[in-house]
């Protein structure tokens, strides 16, 4: 789905360029630009469980880590006039990528800082990740060699993981870390998904010197709606959580060189973070068909870093 979206965005300028001459001023030179990039995605996703009846202390945390997943990224920007532009962008992983997951529990309220149970799952995969972004920019400062804009937009991002096999250390029958073992290699243990809906505001700008151009962007949101789905296959249990008004921060920097007046090659780095916040969670136990709901019983966090190299072409 996301790959198709990128293809549509990148093909749009070709369609526009074939319109009648009467619209040539509106779609003329320096009015539409497209970008296509290849790169990698690395990051970590965290899910937490809290116990409201024990003062909201943390009783469980799962850390999902991945590195260098191949991604395809694209964008199209349309300058409606010299001071206003709209854009669409997105990226998607090209295939799954190996990772690692660590699951820790703190079940003894008398020693809340010491974990009692831990499992490690080196056979973990990032199944997919993707994002789309729609935005509008107002260029309040625009000179021949630099410009600056405020922007507002909406983006959504999704992540999916599976953990298979692994080893464990449990505290059983009143003992402390007294039971160890390994799960069969082919047993799917946990599946996890995150979904974020992010309205944001920010700043963006660039500076050009001869054929070199440098740019950056900053995004902020305090209105993120996050949700996740945690499937414990062995226990036949599903956890679903929702968090509202999370904080989101993103910083992007890029540097490029114009090989022709219309074409620029460039590299870019983007760091993004969704900070942890408590939300409501629901548990569904399929072994006995029971369920329960807890307010402020879950926490969701995500951060990642994207590096890409690509081409920008202006029509």
From Swiss-Prot:
Q: Where is the active site?
A: 103, 105, 230, 232
EC number(s) reported in the record = 3.4.23.-
Query: A Pfam family matched by this chain, by name?
Result: Omptin
Q: Which residues form a coiled coil?
A: none
Highest taxon listed in the record's lineage: Bacteria
Localization, per the record, is: Cell outer membrane
> Which GO-annotated molecular functions does the record name?
aspartic-type endopeptidase activity
Q: From what organism does this protein derive?
A: Escherichia coli (strain K12)
Task: Report the protein's function.
Answer: Protease; also acts as a receptor for bacteriophage Ox2.
Q: What is this protein called?
A: Outer membrane protease OmpP
Q: Which UniProt keywords apply?
A: Aspartyl protease, Cell outer membrane, Hydrolase, Membrane, Plasmid, Protease, Signal, Transmembrane, Transmembrane beta strand
Family designation: Belongs to the peptidase A26 family.
Alphabetical GO CC annotations of the entry are: cell outer membrane
PROSITE patterns per record: OMPTIN_1 (PS00834), OMPTIN_2 (PS00835)
Give the membrane topology, semicolon-separated if more than one. Answer: Multi-pass membrane protein
Predominant location of this chain? membrane
Chain ranges passing through the membrane? none
Which positions carry the signal peptide feature in this UniProt record?
Answer: 1-23
Record keywords: Transmembrane included? Answer: yes
Q: Which InterPro entries match?
A: OM_adhesin/peptidase_omptin, OMP_A26_sf, Peptidase_A26_CS, Peptidase_A26_omptin
